[in-house]
């Protein structure tokens, strides 16, 4: 059973959100070069461009730990961005892509 984690981040301004998106893109590209398995989608609210939502899908608890460890080692996001975060996590019980 896979696990889904949705994080809604609201930044102080659009520039902080854009910086977060750019850093996330770089982390994703590096993960692909290293053949590290990550599965996420990132969306930006078109009417509130300072709001970014990340949707992560993990295989299991072990995979969550591996991804979080990878991200902590490769994370260069400055603390000054400090968005407000709302997180939703749950087991996937139905997935139309499976």
Regions of interest found by a model, annotated:
Residues 15-41, 72-76:
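Short amphipathic alpha-helical segments
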Residues 6-11, 24-26, 32, 89-91:
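N-terminal acidic leader/helix
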Residues 2, 17, 88-92:
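Disordered, low-complexity tails and leader-like regions
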Residues 14-18, 62-65:
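Generic alpha-helical secondary structure signal
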């Amino acid at each position: 059973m896979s696990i889904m984690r949705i994080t809604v981040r609201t930044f102080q301004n659009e520039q902080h959100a854009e910086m977060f998106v750019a850093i996330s893109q770089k982390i994703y590209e590096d993960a692909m070069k290293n053949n590290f398995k990550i599965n996420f989608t990132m969306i930006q609210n078109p009417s509130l461009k300072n709001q970014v939502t990340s949707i992560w899908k993990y295989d299991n608890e072990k995979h969550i730990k591996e991804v979080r460890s990878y991200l902590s080692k490769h994370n260069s996001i400055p603390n000054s961005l400090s968005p407000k975060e709302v997180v939703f996590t749950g087991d996937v019980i139905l997935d139309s892509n499976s």
